[in-house]
């Protein structure tokens, strides 16, 4: 098990290094004045192991720098063979079946490649290439799955991320009273709901921490 975890860690490190190097070469290709938008994405997966788990749902919203929604993008449930759903752990089984997501996936006619292409097309129409960061909660996890399963989408985004969970952790340490009135999560475990909650949460921190 330890050897396997080390191999996974090395694989992730290689992916991240090559990813940053690739995007760093094109930092100057962004269009001046249009790089302040944030691309919010959220994925629902069969688990958190990128070596074996799959993307079940993907959604995207674009905001300006002040967190005003400029465009609400696509939200796709992705169809998979039955064995993918059967391989989920107990937590995912409970929440994804209860939310109705698995039923949506089973009835969806969109596969992973099609979802990736449609998300990429949406980004191409709304933001310049490699200009806007990815936003979300614990969004580094989503980024790893995007890097592996949606590489063209990953390559279109800026290499930086805006992780709301980082701000929450800092507030907990430096301004704990701020968290008492922070927006509460509904825990629907659906992509669009999670994005909207992340935007609302960051707007709260913006108003109360970044005065």
Swiss-Prot record:
Q: What does this protein do?
A: 3'-to-5' exoribonuclease specific for small oligoribonucleotides.
Catalytic site: 159
The answer to keyword Isomerase applying to this record is: no
Give the protein name, as stated in the record.
Probable oligoribonuclease
Q: What is its EC number?
A: 3.1.15.-
One GO BP annotation is:
nucleobase-containing compound metabolic process
Under the GO molecular function aspect, what terms does this record hold?
3'-5' exonuclease activity; 3'-5'-RNA exonuclease activity; nucleic acid binding
> Where do the Exonuclease domain residues begin and end?
38-202
The record's section on CDD domains has: Orn (cd06135)
From which source organism is this entry?
Drosophila melanogaster
According to its UniProt record, which protein family does this protein belong to?
Belongs to the oligoribonuclease family.
Output the Gene3D superfamilies linked to this UniProt entry: Ribonuclease H-like superfamily/Ribonuclease H
Q: Does the keyword Hydrolase apply?
A: yes
Q: Which GO terms describe its cellular component?
A: mitochondrial matrix; mitochondrion; nucleus
User: Lineage of the source organism?
Assistant: Eukaryota, Metazoa, Ecdysozoa, Arthropoda, Hexapoda
State the InterPro entries in the record: Exonuclease_RNaseT/DNA_pol3, Oligoribonuclease, RNaseH-like_sf, RNaseH_sf
The record's keywords, sorted A to Z, are: Exonuclease, Hydrolase, Nuclease
């Amino acid at each position: 098990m330890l050897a396997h975890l080390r191999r996974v860690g090395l694989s992730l490190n290689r992916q991240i290094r090559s990813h940053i190097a690739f995007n760093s070469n094109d930092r100057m290709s962004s269009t001046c004045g249009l790089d302040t938008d944030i691309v919010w994405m959220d994925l629902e997966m069969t688990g958190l192991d990128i070596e074996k788990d799959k993307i079940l749902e993907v959604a995207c919203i674009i905001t300006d720098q002040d967190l005003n929604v400029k465009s609400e993008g696509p939200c796709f449930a992705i169809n998979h063979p039955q064995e993918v759903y059967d391989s989920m752990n107990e937590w995912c089984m409970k929440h994804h079946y209860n939310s109705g997501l698995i039923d949506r996936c089973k009835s969806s006619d969109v596969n992973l490649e099609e979802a990736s292409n449609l998300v990429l097309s949406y980004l191409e129409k709304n933001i310049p290439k490699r200009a806007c960061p990815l936003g979300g909660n614990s969004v580094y996890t989503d980024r790893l799955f995007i890097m592996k399963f949606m590489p063209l989408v990953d390559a279109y985004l800026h290499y930086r991320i805006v992780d709301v969970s980082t701000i929450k952790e800092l507030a907990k340490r430096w301004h704990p009273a701020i968290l008492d009135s922070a927006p509460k999560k509904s825990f629907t475990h659906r992509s669009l709901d999670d994005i909207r909650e992340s935007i609302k949460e960051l707007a709260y921190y913006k108003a109360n921490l970044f005065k």
